[in-house]
Amino acid sequence: MYLAAKNKFQQEQSAKENAGLSRYVPEVLAKLGDPQTAIPRIAKDAQSIRLIERAVHQVPTSHSLYRGDSRDMSGLEPQSVHLVLTSPPYWTLKEYRDSEGQLGHVEDYDQFLQELDKVWKQCFQALVPGGRLICVVGDVCLSRRENGGRHTVVPLHSSIQEHCRKLGFDNLAPIIWHKISNAAYEVEGGSTFLGKPYEPNAVIKNDIEFILMERKPGGYRAPDISTKVLSVISAENHKKWFQQIWSGVTGASTRQHPAPYPLELAERLVRMFSFVGDTVLDPFMGTGTTTVSAAKWGRNSIGFEIDPHYYKLAQKRISEETSSLFSTAVIHSARVD
């Protein structure tokens, strides 16, 4: 009940903010003429892009942080979320804290996928038609020591794609993120897993992650001109971001969380697949990267985190980063039993 009330409040606030977005459009861009020609012109003009980015940082946003299990997000209103952006727990590999309900500790792979399905099903229901579930995930490498003397890769990314397809999502082409990661987290034993240097038959190092694109079937949205202008991506960034292989975005520090993803990556994805004023859901909030990105770029957000330690870290981080960078974000925190 508390979650439903909070979510309803957030959606009412979001609707009010969307209705007033025109006041944040820079005056010099307020009279654009034909949007079909004006938007590309703005995207190629560096000064216009700077004006828009400064304006977006002033858009009021609302963020609900819930300490609870995302396998039960029943309080979310159907079709109330425009984008789901998350990085789910890694099956058995990452060093998660010992908290009740932690999916990363489920030992059976098929059961792990079934538990994830409970989350994806509710994401599907919460998404608007045409909305996307974007899932940042890497495959799981098992060393010889932990897998009966056999090197094995468990294809977590393809398992999630197949399960999401069966739940009703449309699979779209993923982005391949080439990242520099900490090999100690990829496999126990370090170099012994990768094989002997300079000799044949070594094992290829696992240094990519997949950014999966799962789309809920439905039409394409037609936001008003103010929303379009405030959501414009520069021509330079559009060319760099909308390609299938990403490099140059380094992995985030694992000091506070075993499987973080960098703020730059989250900011890109928030801007690529949502509009200013939209609501972004992260069912595995961790330390709050998705929420910080949403707040910075004029989106509302909802986050769930089951681990009380990470939840507190997320609260602290989001409070600090939103207050230091901009003062238009309103944060709501609650526990869901």
Predicted features and spans:
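Short, flexible loop/turn segments with low-complexity composition
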Residues: 224-230, 325-335
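Extended, non-core accessory segments
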Residues: 38-39
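Conserved SAM/SAH-binding loop
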Residues: 68-72, 331-336
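Core catalytic lobe of class I
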Residues: 2-34, 54-313
